[in-house]
A protein has these predicted regions:
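An acidic-aromatic substrate-binding cleft motif
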Residues: 26-42, 201-204, 212, 218-226, ...
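Acidic/aromatic-lined carbohydrate-recognition and catalytic surfaces
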Residues: 72-179, 197-199, 209-210, 216-221
Length: 675
């Protein structure tokens, strides 16, 4: 029961302190967003006003605060009831749902699509998810290529040749694209030596929308292409009549776009943002150079460009589109091939998820072996979403909760409660159950079901008792949504260490793969150690630090965010030169910056020797003096830079106190109200 007290006792103490000054009521006034919400699957969109009204009323009486509509495939045998997504009849059902929910005091969110990921019939081949296809040829001196330069992969008739680069025996590099004839023949032969030629085609992944609802079937869109995103959203504009539909928030599920590692404008965007022509490095891009350092640097630049494209061509435009309808965006950024912190920060409500069950040292708590996944839900993974909200001053952090917690109808509330509390402790304050299916009254028990759900359904035998769990979550969230996060430490996430790998191409940062990209890192080990020892913190990206300021010795990441006492730079190999210079500048302005180790190198390939020299010069200016306990100090301007392998010793030196309750196995979260 330790985790129960860790949430409840701290929450009550905050509530008493905060509200006693203005009212006799201990708890905040209950609002719908404080209650648990639920993902609400519309199977086949086979809905009608009678059953919608009945189900919404049932949810409201049980203490549910809102629904998140996600249309999916239909139930077999009920095809006559299916309604095509975004058709006039479907829009009538949406309007009825919103109006009925409003009358009941419920909120309505909506998936900006059906199933997952985004895609549908409006996405034709030219707007579909794109992948790069490479082919290698060898040409001898004085000879011509004996085959046309055409894509060999099956079902890639629409693939377009975008680059043809030849590499000579003495390091020569030639761009031969303009020497390819319309029939694919290469009108070129090497004058001396044997040459290797690499062709790059923009092909298509051919991925379809998974679990699509009627009217939502089709190709997955190219999330990296702004024009494709516009094509996708224009279908909604037409259905909505460019008018607000009363949706609180549009939702996007976790990024499960497989193999989409390219877009037709990639070369141009790469050259604009990275400063050199990727066409000259096709050999390195496919990993054939042999120089792993150069390969890793090129691929780091490639991955950073992927991040830029996803952020600027999809996430931000999608959010701007939602705002035009007076709605918010709620996004699961995990799984994306980009900087999760920046992607989460670009939306209104960052959303994490739990998948499978966690181990809790609670005597008698059931955990069946089939419920144990390859990776347990990790609070540090959830902190990527909560950090993005905290550092940008956003109020809500949501979670897709209890996904595959157990098998159908085997989930007890005793298993749900600690999972929810673990989310609260990671900064989540807006829980979405995963979930419930809209089931008609004439469906034979147990009604229509979705396979990955814990079945928060009225047909569940636990439903008569669900108000107890709902009320507990609502009371916790009513406090956790009050005020704002009050974490003291800001920990830099060295994303370039993740990107600087010679293996693979894009790196999808999935919750299921944290053993690969998160757990082995010094960043993760430091964060877990600080958490266990009673310190509270958020994570920071390069972009966040670039726009942060210093006021009275505290770090301000946003006008509406709580300030931070310290910036911590974990041990990292790679650090962007601009980021390094910025944190040094912030120290000069009065901030305290703690390095676990000084960075060793700069990422990327362009102007490498120049940037390495600049980093070396900047590092040479940091003349540290010894303090005590292995802590070294460099004073600069109004602030200071500390250097130590033991971050906790530096925090002790700065008189930043830890919460000693963690010594007893308790956990906590900090909130500030009127402060």
């Amino acid at each position: 029961m330790k985790r129960f007290f860790s949430v409840l006792v701290i929450a009550i103490s905050i509530a008493n302190y905060s509200f006693a000054q203005t009212t006799k009521t201990v708890w905040p006034v209950m609002e719908k967003q404080m209650k648990p919400w639920v993902r609400w699957w519309w199977m086949g969109s086979a809905v009608d006003e009678k059953n919608l009204s009945q189900n919404l009323t049932t949810y409201q009486k049980a203490g549910i605060g809102g629904v998140e509509i996600t249309p999916i495939y239909g139930a077999v045998g009920y095809e006559s009831r299916y309604i095509d997504f975004l058709s006039p009849k479907w829009m009538d059902m949406l309007k009825f749902t919103v109006n009925k929910s409003n009358s009941l005091g419920l909120g309505v969110d909506m998936n900006t699509g059906t199933g997952w990921p985004f895609g549908g019939p409006q996405i034709k081949t030219e707007s579909a998810a794109t992948k790069l296809i490479t082919q290698k040829y060898t040409v001898k001196e004085g000879e011509k290529l004996n085959e046309p330069v055409k894509v060999k992969e099956a079902k890639q008739e629409a693939a377009k040749l975008q680059a043809l680069t030849a590499y000579g025996p003495k390091g020569e590099i030639l761009n031969l694209l303009n020497q390819v004839e319309a029939n694919g023949n290469l009108n070129w032969s090497p004058a001396k030596g044997n040459w290797e030629i690499y062709a790059l085609f923009a092909g298509k992944t051919r991925q379809m929308v998974k679990r699509a609802a009627p009217g939502g079937e089709g190709f997955t869109l190219d999330h990296l292409d702004k024009n494709a995103v516009k094509v996708y959203l224009d279908r909604f504009n037409a259905a909505f009549g460019n008018k607000s539909q009363g949706i609180r928030s549009f939702f996007n599920d976790s990024y499960e776009v497989y193999g989409a590692n390219w877009t037709p404008t990639f070369f141009d965007e790469f050259k604009k943002n990275r400063g050199y022509d990727l066409r000259n490095y096709l050999r390195e891009l496919v990993g054939d150079n042999g120089n792993k350092e150069i390969i890793a640097r090129v691929k780091s630049d490639y991955r950073q460009t992927m991040n830029d494209l996803l952020l600027n061509n999809f996430t931000k435009p999608w959010t701007s589109w939602a705002h035009q309808y007076k709605s918010l965006t709620k996004n699961q950024s995990h799984g994306s091939p980009g900087n999760l912190l920046d992607l989460y920060s670009a939306v209104d409500i960052p959303e994490t998820e739990t998948f499978g069950s966690s181990y809790f040292p609670i005597p008698g708590l059931r955990r069946n072996k089939e419920d144990v996944r390859n990776v347990n839900p990790d609070p540090m993974m959830s902190k990527f979403a909560s950090s993005a909200a905290h550092t940008t001053g956003k109020k809500l952090v949501s979670s897709e909760t209890f996904t595959w917690l157990t098998e159908h109808f085997k989930t007890s509330f005793s298993q749900c409660k600690p999972e929810a509390e673990q989310l609260f402790l990671s900064g989540v304050n807006h829980i979405f159950y995963h979930g419930t299916t809209n089931s008609p009254s004439d469906a034979v028990w147990p009604g229509w079901l979705f396979y990955a759900s814990v079945q928060m359904n009225p047909t569940n035998s636990l439903w008569p008792h669900i108000d107890g769990l709902n009320n507990y979550i609502a009371r916790c969230q009513s406090v956790l949504q009050a005020g704002k996060a009050d974490n003291e430490l800001l920990i830099y996430w060295p994303v370039y260490d993740v990107w600087n790998q010679a293996k693979g191409l894009d790196i999808a940062l999935k919750v299921h793969d944290v053993d690969d990209w998160l757990h082995p890192t010094a960043f993760y080990k430091l964060a877990t150690s600080l958490s266990k020892n009673g310190y509270s913190f958020d994570f920071a990206s390069d972009h966040l630090l670039a726009q942060s300021t210093v006021e009275n010795g505290l770090v301000k990441t946003a006008a509406s965010a709580s300030p931070y006492k310290v910036i911590i730079i974990p041990q990292c190999e790679m650090m962007d030169l601009n980021t390094f210079n910025k944190v040094i500048s912030m120290a000069s302005c009065g901030a305290t910056v703690i390095f676990q180790e000084l960075p060793k190198d700069v990422p990327g390939l362009n102007d490498l020797s120049v940037r390495q020299s600049q980093l070396k010069t900047a590092l040479g200016k940091l003349l540290f003096t010894d303090l005590k306990d292995g802590v070294r100090q460099f004073k600069t301007g109004k602030g200071q830079i500390l250097l130590t392998n033991d971050i906790q010793k530096a925090l002790t030196y700065k008189s930043i106190k830890r919460e000693e309750l963690t010594d007893a196995g308790l956990q906590f979260i900090r909130r500030a109200i009127n402060g």
